[in-house]
Each structure stands twice: as C-alpha cells, then as structure tokens.
Design a protein with these regions (language model features):
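Glycine-rich segments within core transmembrane alpha-helices of 12-TM secondary carriers
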Residues: 155-177, 418, 509-519
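Hydrophobic core of transmembrane alpha-helices in multi-pass small-molecule transporters
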Residues: 93, 107-132, 466-483
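Extracytoplasmic gate region of multi-pass secondary transporters
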Residues: 34-38, 368-423, 485, 519-520
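C-terminal ends and interior cores of transmembrane alpha-helices
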Residues: 88-112, 446-463
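Cytoplasmic helix-loop-helix junction between adjacent transmembrane helices
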Residues: 122-159
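Conserved MFS/SLC helix-loop-helix module at the cytosolic interface between two early adjacent transmembrane helices
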Residues: 65-105
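Residue-level signature of mid-helix packing/kink "hotspots" within the transmembrane helices
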Residues: 32, 60-68, 165-166, 415-423, ...
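Cytoplasmic membrane-interface "Motif A"-like loop-to-helix N-cap segments
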Residues: 76-87, 431-446
Length: 566
C-alpha cells in the first residue's frame, strides 16, 4: 500500500473497531437486562428461582447454537446488514417482553404458566437474534487487522461487553429504584406481593437471620387470616439437627404499615434504616423485618422491570440505526486492498464457487484439530467464569456471610479486573508470545486456578483474612479468567483464517455456552446437596483441566495461513 492508502486504511480500521465495539455493547443492553428485571418479576408474579434457572439454561444453550449458525452465515453475509438487523430484532424482542403481561391481560399476583412460557419464548427469540452480534465482528476484525496485531486490538475490542454490561447495570439500577408505580396503599396488591415473596424468598431470610439454625426444612403455604398471612416455618438447630421446630410469622397489614412508616421517616432524614433497627422499632423478628422491608420497597416500584426492557430496547434500536449508518463490510467494500499478511487462496479469485468455499471451511474449521481443542478449552473457561459471575452474589452471602452490597461490589470488581485482564493478555500475547494466544491462555488458566485455590483456602479458614482480601482474590480470578475468554476467539480466528473466522468462532462459542449445564444446574445441585466447598473444588478442577487442554496445543503456530495456502 502507498502512504495515502495506508492512512485511509488506518482510519477505516479504527472506525470499524469503534463502531463494532459500540454495536456489541448495545447487544448487551438487550441481553443482560433480564437479570435486573428478575426481582421485579418474582415480586409481582411469584416466579420461582427454579423457573428462572430453567429459562436461563435453555437461553444459554440457544445462544451458543445461534452464535454457531450465525458464524456460518457471517462468513457469507455483509456484516453491516447482518449486525444491524440482528440488533434491531433483539430490541423488538426486548420491547415485546415488557408488553407481555398487558397482551395476556395478567395483573399482579401468582403468574399462570402461560406468562412464564411467553417470557421464555421471547427470551429464546432474543437470544437467537443475539447470535448475530459477535460473529460479524470476528469476521470484520480479521479482515481489518493483521494477525500480528489482532490479539492486542481485539482484546481492546473485547472490553465492549463489559462496557455494555456496566452501563446497563447503572441504567437498570436507576430504573428499578426510581421508576414504576407505588401500590403500597392497595391492600389487595400488597397481599399478593407478600404471598409471592414469602413463597419464593423468605426461606433464605429465616436461615440468615439466626446463626443457630442448621437448616430451614420448609416454609409452609401461607394461611390467610383477617389481617394478612400467617406463615409456619419448620427448621432445625445446629445443636440438635434431628429435632424439627416450627415458628409462625404474621405478615399483617399493621406490620407492613409500621415498617413502611419507619422506612419513610428514615428517608426524610436522609438515613438508611437497617434490618436490625426495623426489627427493634417494629417489635418483630429480624427475618420478618428484612422480608417486610423488601416487600415495602417492591410495592413502591411495581412495573419498573418493564422499563428495564423498554428503555434499553429503545436505546438498542438507535444503536441498530447507528450500525447501519456508520458500519461497512470488508476493505474491498470501501475500495481498499485486502491485508497482504492475511491473504488466502480464496482471495485470488473474485468469484469462488460454493464447493471451493465449503472445502476451505471444512479444512480450516471442521477438520482442524486446533479449532476443536480451542472449543473444548472454551468449555472449561466458561464454567469457571459463569460459576463466579452467575453465582458470586449467592455464595458470597451464603458461604462467606458478606452483605448483599459487599457481594455485589465484589462481582463488580471481578468484572472491572476482567477488563484489565483482557487488555494485558492481548499485549502479552503479541509482545511475549508473538501472537500465540493459546500460550497466554494456558498461563491465565494457571492464574485463575491458583486464585480460586487461594479463595477456597480462605473460605475454609474464615478468621484468616478480611472480606477485602477475599474480594481481592476473587478479583484476581477475574483478571486471569477474562484473558482466555477474549483470546480464544482471537486464536480461533487466526487458526481458521479470516475466510472462516466467524464459523470457527461460532463452533467455539457453542462449547462455551454448553458449559451452562455445569455452571448453572451443576453448581446449584452441588451447593444444595454437598455445600459450597464442593463447588469451589469443582471450579478449581475445571481450571486444572483447562490448563491441560491448552498445554496440548502449546507448540501450535500463531495462525493457519500457511496451512490455508498449502
């Protein structure tokens, strides 16, 4: 390229990186908003965590297969149209989710199975369309960035999902805490939301309120009384696990109004009233104080969850328009030459027949053992990542006795350190390992396993360190695990070459989201039946297996262009 062409190429290269970064961040706006809406859905419709878990597992698998299918499509389709249309469809699915109760004529109360099924269908549709987010980006970046620079620049690009998730968290946090309707003066709605809370979440409140309790055996069906609901809770004590005790909690209108008055007075004075203070002021147990305060908060913001779909959906629609206006396809589409260092045999012919393209994809992806090893490794990377990301707040509060605020902060730090980890991993790959991303991945998995091992050691000895050290160790795990999360896609793109990069990333992505079978129900089953210590052992074991998988391709070349032209 001459100097003028190089300058123009550089401008378009960075334009493509920035536009696709923003575009993929918008995909997260209408992908992760469901997590923020779940508390509202539980409060208003009594949807259980089990139902959420089933839906989330299905959605994870659907997304993985969608990424694969869209990867195949992305290698044959203009990325500008592929990505912008996909984001538009995701946005429409998000908007439809918020309108579902209106369409079905369902109000506050126990949700019929029909509503859950409709929610599941809309989420599945959304995640089918979500698969059109990453594959076009993987293909474009391999066309615009030479292999020797791809790790660094794509590691920067990979921060897009963390940027999108962080901005969405701020937006949805504001929505859930400030929007919606106040139905706290409606006795009927308060009773319905009380019933929903007691039957889905009260068990944890009772367990956490008293260290002497060994296990909450059962929260019985709430019995309607004149003033509200009477709830019998059966539990055992650590001092005598064989003897089952029963305690009755009264969720009355009088108790609800007393807690609401105490909370409102504290707000007027600019104070945050803790559960212990509420229990003392209102003369009730700590468990009931926590539950009633949560019910008060939820009745003041009913319907806010809908805006967690509507506002991000509208923003994503604008993002889809922006993608259509500013994004272009390969260098050829804007009159620029292809990268010399990444040319393949398919670049030599302007018109390549389907059989030739199919044979090339078969050779570079499906018959390429390195791609299959990377896919297998991705499974273990995602098990470690999702085990911490999805279950972090739960195991930090239940197993490590952290407050919800501190646990949420720990997961946020985990995500932020992940951004730093991705960037550092990309730089190390290019400068230390000459673009061999799989070597960086190996050392990152060693670091992640060591960090989780340290966390497990501190967990077994709670008096050894402070919560700050625990959070720091977990953040270190985030720093290491996000390196492979970003680099595996880069390695797959390089090994398959730019002409099959999206297909390779689609295949690798399937294995990542197949991990939800373990990181979802697998983790929950272990925690319920054997305790959190076995969960941590399992996560460490997954990291060790991941190290061994990466070790098997230590000697692999940086990319597959020599193989493609052989």
């Amino acid at each position: 390229m001459d100097t003028q062409t190089q300058k123009r190429f550089k401008i378009w290269q960075w334009r493509t990186i920035i536009v696709t970064m923003l575009g993929y961040a918008f995909f997260y706006f209408v992908r992760k908003n469901f997590s923020f809406a779940m508390p509202g859905l539980s409060a208003e419709y009594g949807i259980s965590n089990t139902s959420f878990g089933i839906v989330m597992t299905i959605v994870g698998l659907v997304y993985g297969f969608s990424r694969y299918l869209n990867g195949v499509l992305a290698d044959r389709m203009n990325a500008r149209y592929h990505m912008s249309i996909g984001l538009m469809l995701c946005a429409l699915a998000s908007l439809a989710f918020g309108f579902a109760p209106y369409i079905l004529g369902i109000e506050i109360g126990r949700a019929p199975h029909t509503l859950v099924v409709v929610f599941a269908i809309l989420l599945v549709l959304n995640n089918i369309f979500q698969g059109s987010g990453f594959p076009p980006c993987a293909r474009l970046l391999s066309h615009w960035i030479p292999p020797q620079e791809l790790a660094t620049k794509m590691s920067i690009w990979n921060t897009s999902h963390s940027i999108g998730a962080s901005l969405l968290a701020i937006l949805c946090g504001f929505i859930m805490g400030n929007m919606g309707s106040d139905v706290s003066n409606s006795r009927q709605d308060v009773d319905k939301m009380t019933y929903n809370y007691v039957t889905t979440l009260f068990k944890d409140d009772v367990k956490k309120s008293d260290d002497a309790i060994a296990k909450v055996v059962k929260v019985c069906e709430p019995q309607s009384v004149e003033s509200g609901y009477a709830v019998d809770v059966r539990y055992t004590l650590k001092s005598d696990v064989k003897d089952t005790l029963t305690q009755t909690y009264l969720f009355s209108q009088e108790n609800f109004l007393a807690v609401k008055e105490a909370v409102d007075k504290a707000k007027e004075q600019g104070l945050a009233l803790g559960n212990s203070a509420i229990a003392e002021q209102c003369n009730m147990s700590l468990a009931q104080a926590k539950a009633t305060k949560a019910i008060v908060t939820r009745t003041e913001h009913t319907g806010a969850w809908k805006w967690s779909f509507w506002l991000p959906g509208l923003i994503a629609l604008l993002g889809a328009l922006g993608l259509f206006v500013f994004l272009r396809d390969t260098p050829k589409s804007v009159g620029l030459p292809e990268l010399e260092s990444s040319k393949t045999s398919l670049d030599d012919d302007a018109h390549v027949d389907k059989e030739t393209r199919k044979a090339f994809t078969m050779k570079m992806v499906y018959k390429n053992p390195i791609i299959w090893v990377l896919a297998f490794a991705n499974f273990f990377v995602y098990v470690v990542r999702f085990s911490v990301l999805d279950w972090g707040p739960k195991f930090l509060t239940e197993a490590c006795n952290m407050t919800y605020e501190k646990a949420g902060g720990a997961v946020a730090v985990f995500e932020i350190m992940g951004i730093l980890g991705m960037i550092v991993a990309g730089i190390v790959t290019d400068r230390l390992f000459s673009g061999r991303a799989h070597r960086t991945c190996l050392w990152c998995m060693v670091g992640a396993g060591a960090a989780m091992g340290a966390f497990y050691t501190f967990y077994l000895n709670p008096g050894m360190v402070s919560d700050g050290v625990l959070i720091g160790v977990l953040a270190l795990a985030g720093f290491f695990i996000y390196g492979p999360q970003a680099l595996i896609g880069i390695a797959a793109a390089n090994q398959a070459t730019k002409k099959a990069a999206a297909t390779a990333n689609g295949l690798v992505g399937i294995f990542g989201y197949l991990s939800t079978a373990i990181s979802g129900y697998g983790v929950g089953w272990l925690a319920d039946n054997f305790g959190w210590n076995y969960v941590f052992i399992g996560v460490i074991a997954m990291a060790v297996v991941g190290v061994l998988v990466f070790l098997s391709i230590w000697g692999a070349k940086r990319d597959g262009y020599d193989k493609a032209n052989a």
